[in-house]
C-alpha cells in the first residue's frame, strides 16, 4: 500500500533532485505538490516544480502556486547559490500540463481532508504555504500524519552564523508550523551536511542517460563552486533529498525528540531553530519535533544513485 504524500518546494537545485527521487519511491503516492517563493521568486519556483515533475514522467501530479512572499519580512532569494532561475541556468523542457490556479493552501487542505490522518507533507522550502494552511483551516493540523522538513540547524546556520536558509526565509511561518502540534521531523544542517555526493558521483549520474541526468549534472555544476569556496571540496549536499528519502528509508537517519522554537526577534539569532536537546531539564513543553542528528551518508549516496539510474 502506498502512502499519500504532498511535496512543498521552492524548487532550487537540491529541490530538483528531491522531486525526482520522490517519483521513484514505490511506497509513495504523490497526491499533489506546491511551490513557494524561496530560492527564487514564485513564478520561477512554480515553473521549476512543474517542469521537473514532467521531466520525471509525472506531469499528472498537480502543482499549485503558493505564497509569493514571507509573512512579515521581504523575500530574500538565493541567486548566489541557485542562480536567478533557481536551477543554475540548466535548461529543461516546459511542461505541457495544465497550469493550476488554485492556491496551494486550499489544495493542500483538500488533500488532507481526502486522506485524513494519513497524509504526510514533505516541505523543502520556506514554510509559508504550510503556515497559511494552518491559519486558514483550524482543523488542518489534526488531519496531518507528519511533516518532514528540510530546515533549521541546532548548531549553526548557512545563511547567517545562527540560521539556516529555509527557516530564516520566513521565521514567523516556521514558528507557526513548529507550534501547530503537527508531528514534525526536522532535517537540519546537522544531518544534511552528512549526506553528500562527490564530483565522481555526479559524473556517474551523468552517464546514466536518463531524462533527468543532464539537469542534475548541469544544475549542480553551478552550485558546487560555492561549496568549494566554503571549504567543503568538490561535493554537493543532499539537503532536500533527506526528508524525501526518509519516507522509504528511515533507517538512514537517527534523531531525538525535542521541543523547537524559532527566534523571530531581530538580532544575531534571528531565524534560528532553538531546541532543548542539550539541556538537563525540559524547557519547552511541546515536544513534537524529531530532530535528525545522524545520517548514514554512504548508504544514502548509494541508494540515491540507484534510484536515479532506474
Enumerate the predicted regions with their spans.
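Active-site histidine-anchored catalytic micro-motif
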Residues: 2-9, 13-50, 85, 90-194, ...
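A residue-level signal for conserved active-site and pocket-lining positions in enzyme catalytic cores
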Residues: 63, 177, 244
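Metal-dependent C-N hydrolase catalytic cores
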Residues: 3, 46-114, 287-294, 305, ...
Amino acid at each position: 500500500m502506498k502512502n499519500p504524500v504532498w511535496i512543498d518546494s521552492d524548487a532550487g537545485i537540491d529541490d530538483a533532485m528531491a522531486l525526482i527521487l520522490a517519483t521513484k519511491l514505490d511506497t509513495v503516492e504523490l497526491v499533489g505538490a506546491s511551490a513557494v517563493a524561496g530560492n527564487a521568486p514564485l513564478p520561477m519556483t512554480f515553473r521549476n516544480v512543474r517542469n521537473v515533475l514532467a521531466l520525471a514522467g509525472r506531469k499528472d501530479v498537480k502543482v499549485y502556486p503558493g505564497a509569493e512572499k514571507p509573512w512579515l519580512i521581504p523575500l530574500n532569494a538565493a541567486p548566489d547559490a541557485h542562480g536567478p532561475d533557481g536551477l543554475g541556468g540548466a535548461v529543461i523542457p516546459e511542461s505541457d500540463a495544465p497550469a493550476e490556479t488554485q492556491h496551494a493552501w486550499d489544495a493542500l487542505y483538500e488533500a488532507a481532508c481526502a486522506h485524513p490522518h494519513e497524509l504526510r507533507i514533505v516541505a523543502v522550502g520556506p514554510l509559508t504555504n504550510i503556515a497559511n494552511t494552518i491559519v486558514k483551516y483550524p482543523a488542518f493540523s489534526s488531519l496531518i500524519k507528519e511533516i518532514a522538513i528540510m530546515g533549521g540547524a541546532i548548531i549553526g546556520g548557512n545563511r547567517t552564523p545562527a540560521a539556516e536558509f529555509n527557516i530564516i526565509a520566513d521565521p514567523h511561518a516556521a514558528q507557526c508550523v513548529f507550534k501547530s502540534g503537527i508531528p514534525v521531523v526536522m532535517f537540519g544542517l546537522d544531518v544534511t551536511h552528512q549526506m553528500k555526493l562527490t564530483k565522481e558521483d555526479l559524473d556517474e549520474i551523468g552517464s546514466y542517460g536518463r531524462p533527468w541526468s543532464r539537469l542534475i549534472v548541469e544544475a549542480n555544476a553551478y552550485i558546487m563552486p560555492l561549496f568549494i569556496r566554503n571549504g567543503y571540496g568538490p561535493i554537493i549536499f543532499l539537503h532536500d533529498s533527506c526528508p524525501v528519502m526518509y519516507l522509504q528509508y528511515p533507517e538512514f537517519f537517527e534523531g531525538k525528540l525535542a521541543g523547537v522554537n524559532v527566534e523571530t526577534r531581530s538580532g544575531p539569532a534571528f531565524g534560528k531553530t532553538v531546541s532543548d536537546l542539550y539541556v538537563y531539564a525540559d524547557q519547552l513543553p511541546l515536544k513534537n519535533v524529531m530532530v535528525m542528528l545522524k545520517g548514514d551518508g554512504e548508504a544514502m549516496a548509494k541508494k540515491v544513485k540507484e534510484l536515479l539510474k532506474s
